[in-house]
C-alpha cells in the first residue's frame, strides 16, 4: 500500500473526526456562533470525506503504477469502511438518543447532531417515521457490511461471497440516499435552512457520496465476478 495515500486519508478523516469536538468546544467554551461553527464544520466534513474517499485518484507519485481497477477498488473499500463507521456511530447514536438530542439543543454532547440539524435537516430534531425507518435500515446495513468487509479482508480479498455482500450494501446505500433526497426535494425542502451552505453543502454535498460512491462499489464487485468467470472457480462463495 502507498504510504502517501495512507497519510492523505489519515489526514482527511482525522481532520473530520477532530472537527466535531473542536467545533463544540468553540461554541460552548469560546462563545463562537453555533450556526457559523456548524457551517464551517459542514465544509470540513464534505471536503474531508470526499477527498479521503477519492484520494486514490489523486496524481500521487506513489500511485503511478496503479491500474484503474486498483484505484476503483481502493475507493470502494474506503467508502464502505467510512460509511459503515458512520452508520454505527453518528446514525446509531441518533437512533438511540434522538429524544434526548431533540430536547437538548444547547448541550455540548448533542452538538455533533445539532451541527447538522441547524440548517441541514430539521427532521432530525423531530424524528419522523420515515427518517427513523431509513436510519434503522442504514444501521442494519452498516452491521451487515462491517461483517462482510472484515471477512473480505481476512480472506485476502478473495472471497466472492463477501464481495457480493458488500455490493448488496451499496445497493442499500444508493436506495437510502436517493429516498432521503427525494422525500425532502419533492416537498420543497421544508426542513432545510436557507442559504448556500444549508442547501448545497449540508443537505446536498454532505450526502452526495452515498449516491456517487456506490457506482464504484458496483464496478469493484463486477470486476471480481469477471475474475471468477475467467478463472472458472467453483467455490466462488468462499
Which role fits each region the language model picked out?
Residues 126-142:
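A loop-to-helix transmembrane entry motif
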Residues 195-238:
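Terminal transmembrane helical module of multi-pass membrane proteins
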Residues 140-158, 217-220:
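Alpha-helical transmembrane segments in multipass membrane proteins, preferentially the mid-helix core
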Residues 4-8, 23-45, 61-72, 96-100, ...:
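Membrane-lumen (extracellular) interface motif
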Residues 1-16:
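N-terminal membrane topogenic signal
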Residues 46-59, 144, 206-220:
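Hydrophobic cores of alpha-helical transmembrane segments in multi-pass inner/ER membrane proteins
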Residues 84-112:
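Transmembrane alpha-helix/helix-exit interface in multi-pass inner-membrane proteins
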Residues 66-88, 150, 157-172:
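Interfacial segments of alpha-helical transmembrane regions
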